[in-house]
């Protein structure tokens, strides 16, 4: 993402590449004429993961990653945030639906929002709730909770949630009797929204990080109607339901985001069971919801099309490691995509800095979506890369 300095007061830029080394000196370039009003842009590896650099020493020189992100800093003190262009979510409250562990995109989004100052509430799938809360309580996630200032991300409250059910009347008897739901209550979308209202009054940010396709490994021609509709229900309509029920308690000027995938518009063999259709529906719904929520309550709605990540949930696809390798070999930016990069994009999208962005699909995939033909195709075997 390129940053443009529109105001004359932004005069200096500092970039610090992070290439597997522990640290490197920043370079400063004067881009304006008035150094007394200058600001510095200091580099951090990731907003939500300051100082955690990946060791690429085992990779060939041509395949080592090179990335930097920027954080506005005052010239008088590089340890204090500048009033220039910070992502500031202090005083904001976010509800993130779909976190069940610490290695997916939902967790990374939560961490980036927390790093920017937001208060974090989480909705966790009921069968995973006990394990998730126990892991939090026993400190299993403490290492991945570390924020740039050294503190641990605080999850203010974890709510049970099954977003395929809008209200208690929708829950079938076999689910009510299922032992995995025993001991939990108020976990439909309607009930979760009401519990958040009772506990906190309102929220500013709603994040949808939910997807499930029970027949994802099946080709579309072999997918049952039940499996197809289940994928749509869990992966796309759940966003409509969440926004519909949480909108009344969202503060005007807030924002909502979801996570999608390039299979919505390109053929990804193996990503079946109706999941490609579900992602296409999610993106289409994003545009409609942006209009409706925007006009009704000044709420922005966007979706992030993230590249492949080897999370526990993605392992269900079966070929996720192949997709990660494919992305590395063929994307314009040849590096491994991290969850933090998606989290940081989310923090930007829900912040006032993105106040004019709504109804958009934002690609965070090292540019893979822009490619027409894979570079590892035999067509390009003699191409000088």
Swiss-Prot record:
The keyword NAD applies. Disulfide bonds: none annotated. It is an enzyme of class 1 (oxidoreductase). It catalyses: a 2,3-saturated acyl-[ACP] + NAD(+) = a (2E)-enoyl-[ACP] + NADH + H(+). InterPro entries: Enoyl-ACP_Rdtase_NADH, NAD(P)-bd_dom_sf, SDR_fam. NAD(+) binds at residues 98, 105, 162-163, 209-210, 259, 279, 309-313. Residues 1-73 form a transit peptide. Seeds and leaves. Inactivated by phenylglyoxal by binding covalently to two arginine residues. Pathway: Lipid metabolism; fatty acid biosynthesis. One of its GO terms (molecular function) is enoyl-[acyl-carrier-protein] reductase (NADH) activity. GO terms for cellular component: chloroplast. Keywords: Chloroplast, Fatty acid biosynthesis, Fatty acid metabolism, Lipid biosynthesis, Lipid metabolism, NAD, Oxidoreductase, Plastid, Transit peptide. GO terms for biological process: fatty acid biosynthetic process. Catalyzes the NAD-dependent reduction of a carbon-carbon double bond in an enoyl moiety that is covalently linked to an acyl carrier protein (ACP). Catalyzes the last reduction step in the de novo synthesis cycle of fatty acids. Involved in the elongation cycle of fatty acids which are used in lipid metabolism. Required for normal plant growth. Belongs to the short-chain dehydrogenases/reductases (SDR) family. FabI subfamily. Homotetramer. This is Enoyl-[acyl-carrier-protein] reductase [NADH], chloroplastic. It comes from Brassica napus (Rape).
């Amino acid at each position: 993402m390129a940053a443009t300095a529109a105001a004359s007061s932004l005069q200096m830029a500092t970039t610090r590449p992070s290439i597997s080394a522990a640290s490197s000196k920043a370079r400063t370039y004067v881009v304006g004429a008035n150094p007394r009003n200058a600001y510095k842009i200091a580099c951090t590896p990731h907003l939500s993961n300051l100082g955690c650099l990946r060791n690429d020493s085992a990779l060939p020189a041509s395949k080592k990653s090179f990335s930097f992100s920027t954080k506005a800093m005052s010239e008088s003190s590089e340890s204090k945030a500048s009033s220039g262009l910070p992502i500031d979510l202090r005083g904001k409250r976010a509800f993130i639906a779909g976190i069940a562990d610490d290695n997916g995109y939902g967790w990374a989004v939560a961490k980036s929002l927390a790093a920017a100052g937001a208060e974090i509430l989480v909705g966790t799938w009921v069968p995973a709730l006990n394990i998730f809360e126990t892991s939090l309580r026993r400190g299993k996630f403490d290492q991945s909770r570390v924020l740039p200032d050294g503190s641990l991300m605080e999850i203010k409250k974890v709510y049970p949630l099954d977003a395929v059910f809008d209200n208690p009347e929708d829950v079938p008897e076999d689910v009510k009797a299922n032992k995995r739901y025993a001991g939990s209550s108020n976990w439909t979308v309607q009930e979760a929204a009401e519990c958040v209202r009772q506990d906190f009054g309102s929220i500013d940010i709603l994040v949808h990080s939910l997807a499930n396709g029970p027949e994802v490994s099946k080709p579309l021609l072999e997918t049952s109607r039940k499996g197809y509709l289940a994928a749509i229900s869990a992966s796309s309509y759940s966003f409509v339901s969440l926004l519909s029920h949480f909108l009344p308690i969202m503060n005007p000027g807030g924002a909502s985001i979801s996570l999608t995938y390039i299979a919505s518009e390109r053929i990804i063999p193996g990503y079946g069971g109706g999941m490609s259709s579900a992602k296409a529906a999610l993106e289409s719904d994003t545009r409609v919801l942006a209009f409706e929520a925007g006009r009704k309550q000044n709420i922005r709605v966007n979706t992030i099309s993230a590249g492949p990540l080897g999370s526990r949930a993605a392992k269900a696809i079966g070929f996720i490691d192949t997709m990660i390798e494919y992305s590395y070999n063929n994307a314009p930016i040849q590096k491994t995509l991290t969850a933090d990069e998606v989290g940081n994009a989310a923090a930007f999208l829900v912040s006032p800095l993105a106040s004019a962005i709504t109804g958009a699909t934002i690609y965070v995939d090292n540019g893979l979506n822009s490619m027409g033909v894979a570079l590892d195709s035999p067509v390009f075997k003699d191409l000088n890369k």
